[in-house]
From Swiss-Prot:
Its EC number is 2.4.2.29. Its cofactor is Zn(2+). Catalyzes the base-exchange of a guanine (G) residue with the queuine precursor 7-aminomethyl-7-deazaguanine (PreQ1) at position 34 (anticodon wobble position) in tRNAs with GU(N) anticodons (tRNA-Asp, -Asn, -His and -Tyr). Catalysis occurs through a double-displacement mechanism. The nucleophile active site attacks the C1' of nucleotide 34 to detach the guanine base from the RNA, forming a covalent enzyme-RNA intermediate. The proton acceptor active site deprotonates the incoming PreQ1, allowing a nucleophilic attack on the C1' of the ribose to form the product. It comes from Rickettsia bellii (strain RML369-C). It comes from the Bacteria. Zn(2+) binds at C302, C304, C307, H333. This is Queuine tRNA-ribosyltransferase. The active site is at D92 (proton acceptor), D264 (nucleophile). Belongs to the queuine tRNA-ribosyltransferase family. It catalyses: 7-aminomethyl-7-carbaguanine + guanosine(34) in tRNA = 7-aminomethyl-7-carbaguanosine(34) in tRNA + guanine. Homodimer. Within each dimer, one monomer is responsible for RNA recognition and catalysis, while the other monomer binds to the replacement base PreQ1. Pathway: tRNA modification; tRNA-queuosine biosynthesis.
């Protein structure tokens, strides 16, 4: 089995392109990870997700621990077999969802106690339990358990939260079962305070994670402030850097130019289900009546099924009447667009060219 590794093949200014080698195959970077929260990318077959060019997708610890449970998925052979996905899977730690979805939650040094948003059952999620769940799922890349600092936060609030994340990172690292081809990433926190993010990075580097994530951003602070405190330069040059929850094309391009390697976001899938398509000419709201008799495809040179086989008029019709096929085709197109964007970014880095495109 291959060892987990990251090789940078090309670098232009701060932007890098390379290959992450894992037990479940290679990941070309910079990489965009479609979000498969509950063991599925909404409105897509797993093989269709692969056809868009995705090398890796994201699963969610919080949702999978509630339904159908990590133990059941392990009994059935792990998440890869369960959902018929043979490529790498990264699972988040569950911390963000606990904070955002569970209204009745209590944070202590031990972890987070919360009530399920599904049936009200009480749970305790600790660094050890989060790491165990991800191991049961068979995650290729496991995330350390963290507290996603609420925004806005005062300096002292952000410092207290960041220090808790650091202590939890120590426990997550101790609980992680090291195996060839598998990895665990630590998560940098610190809200919008560069000083705290630098300290968080220094603390987590001591734990020698296989990669590092930048968490707690894209939560309302705006692009300018996000880029100001992004701080990938604080992280090791030879390990992957993952900006969590960021997926607007302009944000991806800006973050890559600052040295980030991995991204995930629900934007392409959620937007697709809501009738919004990403194109190189800008976004298209297919619900708009001006597309009712438009016989042209979304993008003539796009190779996705939506563009190769159907007109904007047909997609308009499907979305307006709420047909499932509309959500499927729009999602397929958006995921293809995002993978094409990443491919173009990798090509520009290899050629040593500035990113002269915005979408």
């Amino acid at each position: 089995m291959s060892k987990f590794s990251f090789n940078i093949n090309h670098q232009y200014k701060k932007a890098r392109s390379g290959i992450i080698t894992t037990a479940h195959g290679n990941i070309r970077t910079p990489a965009f990870m479609p979000v498969g929260t509950r063991g599925t990318v909404k409105a897509m077959l797993p093989e269709s997700v692969a056809e868009t060019g995705a090398d890796i997708l994201l699963g969610n610890t919080y949702h999978l621990m509630l339904q159908p449970s990590a133990e059941r998925i392990a009994k059935l052979g792990g998440l890869h077999k369960f959902m018929n996905w043979g490529k790498p899977i990264l699972t988040d730690s569950g911390g963000f969802q606990v904070m955002s979805l569970s209204k009745l939650r209590k944070i202590t040094e031990e972890g987070v106690s919360f009530n399920s948003h599904i049936n009200g059952d009480k749970y305790l999620l600790t660094p050890e339990r989060s790491t165990e769940i991800q191991h049961l799922l068979g995650s290729t890349i496991t995330m350390a358990f963290d507290e996603c600092t609420p925004y806005p936060a005062t300096f002292e609030e952000a410092k207290t939260s960041m220090q808790l994340t650091t202590r939890w990172a120590h426990r997550s690292r101790e609980a992680f079962v090291k195996r060839d081809g598998y990895a665990q990433f630590g998560i940098i926190q610190g809200s919008t305070y560069e000083e705290l993010r630098e300290q968080s990075a220094k603390d987590l580097i001591e734990l020698d994670f296989e990669g590092y994530a930048i968490g707690g951003l894209a939560v309302g602070e705006g692009q300018e402030l996000m880029f100001k405190v992004l701080a990938p330069d604080f992280l090791p040059q030879n390990k992957p850097r993952y900006l969590m929850g960021v997926g607007k094309p302009a944000d991806i391009i800006g973050a890559v130019s600052r040295g980030v390697d991995m991204f995930d976001c629900v934007i392409p899938t959620r937007s697709g289900r809501n009738g919004q398509a990403f194109t190189k000419y800008g976004t298209v709201n297919i619900r708009n009546s001006k597309y009712a008799e438009d016989n042209d495809p979304l993008e003539a040179d796009c190779l996705c099924p939506a563009c190769q086989n159907y007109s904007k008029a047909y997609l308009h019709h499907l979305v307006r009447i709420g047909e499932i096929l509309g959500a499927m085709l729009m999602t397929w197109h958006n995921l293809t667009y995002f993978q094409n964007l990443m491919s173009r970014i990798r090509e520009y880095i290899a050629l040593g060219k500035d990113f002269d495109f915005t979408t």
